[in-house]
């Protein structure tokens, strides 16, 4: 192999590595984490307020002054049994981000905005450091602020990391995660527990949390599982226009819907503005918004839901952002065009999407 060939091969390998390298995830206002959540407590009974089956939790960082302020979607029942939907604010102070011993996994409409001694999207820096450096740590969590604290010991499964796929700004990236398991205890109940942690220097993130049934062992079918499936944050460049120009098809990242509904969540507003701005300057002619679902539910239900979600995006773009209605068509494809397997929680979440395609091709 000549020196020129060697140099060329090295350059190609470096370029390929750069394409798959995980981008730095900022901890700043405007960053949005989308978490797929699955509850299956059919064998033990569903606690009040907990949605059964798949749902999504959308958490935006809104402020990083003196800690981290979150704005999270809520869909469920309040303490009085009334069904509620809205935004829940949660503040984690800088001190708690550093040293808190309890992680609150969920965001409930009845919860106070700040709870001393607790973290939110991930364990504290101190808990994470103990796990990474010593291989073991004491860990506690609550599902919501008002729920009981469940505690135990987490042990790192190996000295290395495992790869965990996440869509970051629409691009599939494999993040390096620290894996830990343990048996956590509440009273006489013991539950197997697993967590995968992104060891972020500013804010460790629980990429996956799962626990099994009472007195269950490993491996286990989760009663509860939560996985980060998307991370969206503002970037430079017009990715929508670039995607249309290249492939005449682009997935609209940053559009989030209420559980089993076509109601667009408030955290979608920044994405809607970006889409409208891109389309107003795009040379493309007529465009079609296409809705897609997972395979949970009947074919008819999924067809109707996907069509209603595409219509909802069109309505928002026309009503709130001044796009011409005749330029936008809509279609619903239900579960028929998956991009990933429907056999996993993350795969089903990624199949629930809206795409924009050129209608004249």
Regions found by a protein language model. Name each.
Residues 5-15:
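Bacterial N-terminal signal peptides
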Residues 21-67, 72-97, 135-248:
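Acidic, serine/threonine-rich low-complexity disordered tracts
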Residues 93-150:
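Beta-strand/loop-rich accessory regions of lumenal/periplasmic or secreted enzymes
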Residues 175, 204, 252, 284, ...:
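Extracytoplasmic
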Residues 194, 269, 273-276, 302, ...:
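Extracytoplasmic/secreted envelope proteins and their assembly/folding machinery
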Residues 216, 220-287, 322, 361:
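Periplasmic peptidoglycan-binding/tethering modules of Gram-negative envelope proteins
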Residues 265, 290-361:
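Periplasmic OmpA-like peptidoglycan-binding domain that tethers envelope proteins to the cell wall
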């Amino acid at each position: 192999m000549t020196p020129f060939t060697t140099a060329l091969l090295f350059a190609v390998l470096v370029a390929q590595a750069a394409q798959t390298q995980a981008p730095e995830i900022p901890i700043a206002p405007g960053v949005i984490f989308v978490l797929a959540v699955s509850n299956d407590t059919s064998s033990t009974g569903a606690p009040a307020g907990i949605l059964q089956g798949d749902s999504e939790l959308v958490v935006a960082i809104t402020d990083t002054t003196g800690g981290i302020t979150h704005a999270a979607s809520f869909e469920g029942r309040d303490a009085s049994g009334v069904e509620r939907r809205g935004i829940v604010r949660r503040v984690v102070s800088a001190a708690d981000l550093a040293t808190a011993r309890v992680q609150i996994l969920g965001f409930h409409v009845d919860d106070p905005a700040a709870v001393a001694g607790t973290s939110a999207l991930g364990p504290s820096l101190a808990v994470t450091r103990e796990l990474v450096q010593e291989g073991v740590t004491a860990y506690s969590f609550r599902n919501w602020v008002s729920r009981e604290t469940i505690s135990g010991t987490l042990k790192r499964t190996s000295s290395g990391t495992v790869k965990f796929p996440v869509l970051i700004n629409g691009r599939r990236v494999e993040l390096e995660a620290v894996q830990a398991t343990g048996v956590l205890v509440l009273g006489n109940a013991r539950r197997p527990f697993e967590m995968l942690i992104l060891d972020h220097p500013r804010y460790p993130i629980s990429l996956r949390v799962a626990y099994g049934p009472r007195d269950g062992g490993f491996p286990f079918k989760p009663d509860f599982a939560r996985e980060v499936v998307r991370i969206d944050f503002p970037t430079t460049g017009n990715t929508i226009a670039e995607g249309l120009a290249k492939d005449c098809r682009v997935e609209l990242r940053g559009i989030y819907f209420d559980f089993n509904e076509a109601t667009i969540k408030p955290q979608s507003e920044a994405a809607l503005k970006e889409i409208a701005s891109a389309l107003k300057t795009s040379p493309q002619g007529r465009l079609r918004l296409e809705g897609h679902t997972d395979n949970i539910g009947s074919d008819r239900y999924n067809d109707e839901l996907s069509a209603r979600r595409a219509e909802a995006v069109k309505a928002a773009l026309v009503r709130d952002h001044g796009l011409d209605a005749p330029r936008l068509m809509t279609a619903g494809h239900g579960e028929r065009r998956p991009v990933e397997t429907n056999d996993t929680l993350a795969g089903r979440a990624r199949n629930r999407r809206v795409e924009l395609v050129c209608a004249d091709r």
